[in-house]
Each structure stands twice: as C-alpha cells, then as structure tokens.
Amino acid sequence: MPKRTDLQTILILGSGPIQIGQAAEFDYSGTQALKALKKEGYRVVLVNSNPATIMTDPDLADATYLEPLTPEFVRKVIEKERPDALLPTLGGQTALNLAMELNANGTLKEFGVELIGANAEAIHKGEDREAFQAAMKKIGVETARGKMVHSLEEAIEYQKEIGLPIVIRPSFTLGGTGGGIAHTYEDFLKITEGGLRDSPVHSVLLEESILGWKEYELEVMRDHADTVVIITSIENFDPMGVHTGDSITVAPAQTLSDVEYQRLRDYSLAIIREIGVDTGGSNIQFAVNPENGRVIVIEMNPRVSRSSALASKATGFPIAKIAALLAVGYHLDELPNDITRVTPAAFEPTIDYVVTKIPRFAFEKFPGTPDALGTQMRSVGEVMAIGRTFKESLQKALRSTESDVRGAFAEMSTEDLRGLLYGNPRRLEAVIELLRRGEGVPAVHDATKIDPWFLSQIQEIVDAEKELLNLGPITEWKYELWREVKRLGFSDARIGEIVGLPELEVRALRKAAKATPVYKTVDTCAAEFEAYTPYHYSTYEWEDEVTPTDKPKVVILGSGPNRIGQGVEFDYATVHAVWALQEAGYETIMINSNPETVSTDYDTADRLYFEPLTFEDVMNIVEHEKPVGVIVQLGGQTPLKLAKRLAEAGAPIIGTLPETIHQAEDRASFNALCERLGLPQPRGKVAQTPEQARELAAELGFPLMVRPSYVLGGRAMRTVRSMEELTTYLDEVYAAVEGQPSILLDQFLEGALELDVDTLCDGERAVVAGIMEHVEAAGVHSGDSACVLPPVTLSPELLERVKADTERLALELGVKGLLNVQWAVKDGVAYILEANPRASRTVPFVSKAVNHPLAKYAARIAVGQTLEQIGFTETPLPDLYAVKEVHLPFLKFKGVSPILGPEMKSTGESMGIDTDPYLAYYRAELGAKSNLPLSGTALLLGDGLDGVAATLESAGLRVIHEQEGDRLPDLLIDVTGSPLLRTALERGVPIVSTREGAEWTAKAIAAAQGKTLGVRSLQAWQQREAAAS
C-alpha cells in the first residue's frame, strides 16, 4: 500500500530531558523519523523541551516547539498547528504516556487528530500489566505468575499466596522506576508503597521471582499487511534480576538452540499480532528457565525503545525510520533496504559478527548509594563493540568503556572479589579476575547464574593471557601469531601489560610484523549482497572490505558512552561538524562507540567506524584512511585526552592544537597566562602531594574549592571548609583516581554569581557567541545550575569587560574553534575560574538561543575558514530570554540527599524561551518536570527567605515555615538541607535547595500567575530575531 495522502501534517512528541532509562536513543530515533517523513513530503511538527538534541534543530522539523511535554502545552500546539496525526512511538515512555493522556482527555478527538504508529488499544494492551497478562493467556503464552494490585492491603493478601522473593512492577513507569525485588517482608511493604505512588495509574504487578533465569529480547516489526520481521535477537549476559538496560547484552543470542529460537520467534509473532501493533516496531522480552526450558514472556514495549536503537546499530536496519514510514501506510516489502539497495525491508537482517553492549554507570557521583543492580535502571550510558567472535567483541566493548581491563581488581583479595559476584557494575571485571585466579567456571556460575557458555568464553580469554607468556619473545612474533592474538580482541596496551612492555613498543613490533587490522562492513545480509552504506568495524582477518577514497577527508572523534558530565550535547557538536564539513566538500569519517547517538547513524557521516575511542583504535583508522585532519575538540574530554598522543604519533590534529589544550588545562601555565593578561583570578595553588596540599591550604585559608586536574563534570570536585575536611577529601581522591593527580586548590568565592561564556576564535579574531548568567551561586557545578541568556542582573559595563577579556584570552591561547570560559562575579569584579578550549555542554543551548550553529562554525574554522568568511563577526543580541534548566536523577539513587554541589549530577536539560526571563524560567522548570504550583501552600525552611516569602504571598500562595503534621506542601523551599527534601522529592513535590533558586522560582510563579502562556515555534522565534536585526 503506498503512503497515505489524507495526512498533511504529522505531530511528533520527543522524550524531553535526557534521564536514566530514556537517553540519546530517542534523539537518534526521532531524528531518523523526522528526516524520513519530511522526505516523503509531510509537514512535521515536533514538541520536545530538550535543546541538546539534533531533532530540535530548526532545519529538521517544519515547526519545532521547545515547550514542556505536558498535556496543557501539547494541546496548545495542536490547537495552533492542527496536525492530522500524532506519532507517539518515537519519544520513549514520556511520549507514549502523554499521547494516552491526550487521548483520554478528549484533546485528540476534539481536534480530529489520529494516533498513528500504535493505536490507543494496542498501547494499553502492551503497557497495562493486567491487559497484557489477559492477552497472553488468550494466545497461550505463559507469563510469570502474578497479580495486579491497586492497594497495599490487596498486595499483602497476594504476597501471602506467592511468598518471597517477589517482584514489584509499577504500571506505566520508565526504566522500572518505583519497582524492585523484595527479599524480605519489610522491603516488600516499602517497595510496594513506593510503586503504588510512582505509577501514574496507582497500580503495581506482583510477580513470582524468576531470578537467575536467562533473559532474551526480540526486536520485531509488523506492517498493515501483517508482514512480521524479526530484526535481531538479543541475549542478556546478566541473568534475570538485572534491568535489561543495566545488563551486558549480546546480539545475536549466543546460547539458544535453533528450536528454542524458533519458539521465541513464533511467540513474538503471536504477541505482536494479538497486541495489535500493526505499523511499527516492538521489543519483546522473554525469560527462559535454564533448568527445564520453561519460557515466559516478561513484557513488551509497543514503541521504539533503547533496545531498538541497539538493534538498529547492531544490524544496520533503521528501525525508527522504517517504523515512521509504516505508520504512514507503507508496507515492509515496498521499502528498500538503504544498505543493499536491492533487498526490501521485509528481508530479515542476517549478521556474520557479534555485537556486545556494556552499560556505563555513575555511582561515583552518588556516594553512599548501594550499587546493587535490580529491576530499576541505573546506568547513564552504554558502549557497543563489533567483533567476529564474542571474545573479540567483549574485549573491544570493555576498552570502549574507558575502564582498564585489570586496574584495581588485580590488587583485591579473592574473598573481596567473590563479594562482587552479585549484580553490580563491577561484576564482569570481578568474574574475569576470579577466573584468572583459577576459581573455575562451575563455581562462578553457581554464584552468578551467568550462562556457562559465556563464562567458558571468558575462561578462554584468560587462558590466552597465560599462553602469551609461553609464545616466545614478543620481538620474534610473526604475522600469523600476531593475528591470532589480536583476533581474540587483545589491545596493544593489554598485551604490553601482560608481557611487561609499554604500549608504544608493542604497537611498533606489531606494525613491523605487518599485523594491522582489516575493516569489515555492516551490511544486514552477511555479505550476500553488495553494501552501499559505509558502516565499518575492525578485525584481524585477511580480506579488507574498505578501500579509502582519494577525496580530502576529515576524521571527527565522537564522545563515547554518555555519562554525567559528558552527554548528548557533545554528540550534537560532532554531528554539526560532520554536516559543516560535508557542505565544505570534505569526506567525513566518524569514529564512535555509542549506539544511542545520531553520530553513529549509518547515514550521518560519509564513513562510520564503530570502534573504541582509544589511541590504538583511532590511530589504526587514521593510518588506514590518511585524512587531512582529525578533530578532537568537539567530543568532550574523551577525544581531548587522546589529542597529545595522536599528534605525537603523526595524526594531523586540526582546529585547536594539543599544546593549547594543555596550556588551558594545566593550572600553573594557565594561571601564568591570566597574570600576564591582567585577568583577576581567585588565589590558587597546585599541589603535587597530599602533604603539599595541606601546607598550601594553610597558606591560602578556607573555604577552598579543591579538585584534581583534567576532569570533566566536576568529578571529585568539592568545597572544603577545614583542614579535617581537606584530609578526608585527599584520602578519597588518591584512593579513587588513577595515578597521582595534581590537586588544584582555589580560594572559594562564597556567594559569587557565575557566568558561562561561549566564544569562537579563528586565531585572528575572537567573537563571544553568548554569555549565560547562572541562577545558582558559585559552589554549584555549572552543569547543574540553571542559566539564563542574556544575563539579567549584571551591568552592561561589567558584561562588556567580560566579553573583551574572554576574546583577548581566546586570541592569546591561539584557539581555533570553540572556547568556553567560566567567570565568577563578586563585589563588582569578574574573576576567571577556568577556560576550556573545546565545545562545551552549553553549545546546543546557545546555538538555539542566538540562532547560530556554533559547532558548524568551529568545524569550518578547523579547515581554515575565517569568522569573516563564515559571516560571524559580532556578538548576537537576541531579543528574547532563553533559560536552560537541568534534570537530576536523585530519584534513581535511594537515600541520596538532593542537594547541589561542585560535582555534576544532572543527566539532561530543558529549555524555555520567552520575552520575560522569569516566564522563560517557568517554562524551563515545567520542561524539566518540576511542576511549579500557581496555588496552594509553600513551605520555606532556612534564613534569608523573607523576600521569597513576600513574592510568593503576593502571587497568592499560602506560605508556612513549619511542616503541618505529615502533610507535604505543594512547593518546598529548603536551604537547610534537611531530610524533608528527599521525602518531598519522592512524593513528587517540587523542591528548591538554594536561595538563588528560591528567588527565581518565586518570581517565575508570580510572573506566570494569571497569564495564559502561548506557544511559539523555534522557527518563529528565529524569524522574529532576523526581523529585529
């Protein structure tokens, strides 16, 4: 069936700020769908509050609304844009839940908007636990024994029947939020109460425990003609009990027999048909009892999911794009496979390699949180690696996570290692180390329930490590031997660690033996047809499938796995660089290891290498492709850390040079440079040892801001107010950070106002692109503070001085590209805190606020264009206020106090735009899911809040200063840091923990009071800007 012509305008809902359980994969999915629908001639309207995404760029959708994802705001967009259809399956759980609300409250019916991609009934059957169980019973597919309960009393009755351990799954929540596995009756009561509260429909499913069973996922697509294809099978390395988003996963499934696979396949076909998903993709999860082969279905997601992104990258099959086209009427056999150009999308992908995904965690950001993994997702990012065997794929994935293969585990006692065999982020490394020590596969399997096949594969890697020492001197290894060793996935660094040589010597010996990798192509068909899409991975075999072209080419290094401090903002910058360089006539080569992102889409760069971002893997590609330039300044700290070694090995780094990066990041040379330029700085010193740190602290006086050099996201940064606090801090840092880092000690400017300044420089001219005023005072990490552009409270004279000083600094450093400078203003003086000669996390926000693609400009500067040629010679002065607010993941980390400090903790951001700064702030707060009340009670705790109280009272809120019994207020402002902050957060009450935040919150509520807030697209804002200028 050809595409529908009765639809003209299609509304797509994004997923909002990046959060745990809902990350960059939805930017990738949404971007793919937007491009596909636009190409088909549809008018596309997007609502998404997250400015750090590619999908919210003004040239993707026809109308882009950076507005809160709430029924009220989406209704306003629908009223204004009058879409014919709503496609809700590309924005994760947020979009699906919102679409269901708009359907239930009559908005869709009122404006004649059709749900496409999945109908309301299919969403209900797939998402509602009771409806799903009933549907499975009807088709004879077994589910875990369980019951949906709607009250604690009902739960207690059913628990008596089913016993412990028991699994609690709230309905309609994201990433397992509010759920868990209860091993004790006390835990059962606590988790069930929380789950009933967290579920938007106040119901939870109680299920028998299937801990230790094997877990599989099938990625399935179905069209209107009832053609169903299985895109891939995915097997969880970790057994049941760990959320699939936190599990190491492998595609295709490795331990299923053909009969078992066909059984899961048949079940999947029956399930997708019964649920009624007939225009898109679904992810179906199964558990298999290894004792008797009993199969039960765990759940399905009737939408594009995190696993869909992984399956797309693993196979080369663009699930989100195909799902969007099926939603507008196409059938699978009508859609061509982009990669082969001869097979239709109805052909199931076949792969002749193994893909491994390893999650990335951030428990170090939340000290005191237990790191046990369960049914609630806790990982903040992930890596993917491709190899010809599981062993090669696993070792490549491990080095992609940027964690040492052995590291601290070699120093641990065997008893301590055994203590790490429960589900936790360090279990894989503990398993490897125990197998090294002869623990044996049966003992490790008994303790972990990890399938013996996986453990025996790891045992083979460990045996090979020992064998390396019996192969004779490494200086005499011949090509064949090198190839056999490298085919197991060993890096040069790991080989060097085993044989006792530096990595560079191992590399030189390997190259002398002519043992270099070949590159294979991801083609969806196991090389049966020619592939036209250049998507590659390395291995050590004979045939190389990748022939470099003669065109001038530039390599762009991606940012690797998302983590707190290095998120989707850096992917945004690298993708913009790709587009800018393609426009300038260069062939672009992307190297990255993150399966969630737009940068690793096969049709973003001219060539994609899905490889670890390590010195060895990057240099192999550079030597293979011979580019004219390598760009390291856009992917965050990961590529920056490689810059110096790459340059020394002959990689042609373009843009800002490694020497400049070093000068800005090395505190002593940076301090000297600022002194030379006469830029005020807080008094500071650099200590090389703990003893020296204590001596310098006594000299500088307290309070001090302390941190190790070369970190991103304020890792291990703290404010210390006494010698005791400093000593505790030093003990922790030297235990946690590799090597012996130098420690920076800076006088802490208590109560100072911070500024973030993004600047472009071509070496001859520097232009400030935007100055952001932080809402929170100094002491809160810049990545966790809300900020407003342009500044609201500072004098024009001071801002002019900051602008001039920033531009002088950029020229003095010799920056060629982007520079981010942070300032602190106290008593009318602007002190420079730090300068980062790279893309910062504010680049997407500033680009959208000032209507200039800064990362594109940086890429053009890197290949020799000047700011004059680009047409960016003056600081833009937008006639609007833009506010960036952050999303904090405290709810996922039980018991952690939700107080902001110098270590970054946020995972994502939202943006609000208005002509009034406080209304922009109000929109940004709603966009970040902080629902500021316009009526009700505000509880204020702490000194210095009289002005806040007066503002809130004038806005009509009742202000109290003591809690009334157990009753929680509608808004909590608590600058004392009391435990009530955590309680309020868990109950969904908006919380504010800083005085500055309290002032902005009160003014925002007052500004919004009695106003009808309209909606305006980003394109309309930018046209308004263009007209004004």
Swiss-Prot record:
Keyword tags: Amino-acid biosynthesis, Arginine biosynthesis, ATP-binding, Ligase, Magnesium, Manganese, Metal-binding, Nucleotide-binding, Pyrimidine biosynthesis, Repeat
SUPFAM superfamilies named among the record's database cross-references: Carbamoyl phosphate synthetase, large subunit connection domain, Glutathione synthetase ATP-binding domain-like, PreATP-grasp domain
Chain intervals for the UniProt region annotation (Allosteric domain): 930-1029
InterPro entries in UniProt: ATP-grasp, CarbamoylP_synth_lsu, CarbamoylP_synth_lsu_oligo, CarbamoylP_synth_lsu_oligo_sf, CbamoylP_synth_lsu-like_ATP-bd, CbamoylP_synth_lsu_CPSase_dom, MGS-like_dom, PreATP-grasp_dom_sf
Residues that coordinate or bind Mn(2+) 3: Q822, E834
Residue ranges constituting the MGS-like domain according to the UniProt record: 930-1028
Stated name of the protein: Carbamoyl phosphate synthase large chain
Cofactor note: Binds 4 Mg(2+) or Mn(2+) ions per subunit.
The protein's assembly and partners: Composed of two chains; the small (or glutamine) chain promotes the hydrolysis of glutamine to ammonia, which is used by the large (or ammonia) chain to synthesize carbamoyl phosphate. Tetramer of heterodimers (alpha,beta)4.
Residues binding Mn(2+) 1, per UniProt: Q285, E299
GO cellular component: cytoplasm
GO molecular function: ATP binding; carbamoyl-phosphate synthase (ammonia) activity; carbamoyl-phosphate synthase (glutamine-hydrolyzing) activity; metal ion binding
Binding locations of Mn(2+) 4: E834, N836
A GO BP annotation: L-arginine biosynthetic process
Superkingdom to which the source organism belongs: Bacteria
Ligand binding (Mn(2+) 2): E299, N301
Region of interest (Carboxyphosphate synthetic domain), residue spans: 1-402
NCBIfam families, per the entry: CPSaseII_lrg, PRK05294.1, PRK12815.1
Binding-site list for Mg(2+) 3: Q822, E834
Pathways per UniProt: Amino-acid biosynthesis; L-arginine biosynthesis; carbamoyl phosphate from bicarbonate: step 1/1; Pyrimidine metabolism; UMP biosynthesis via de novo pathway; (S)-dihydroorotate from bicarbonate: step 1/3
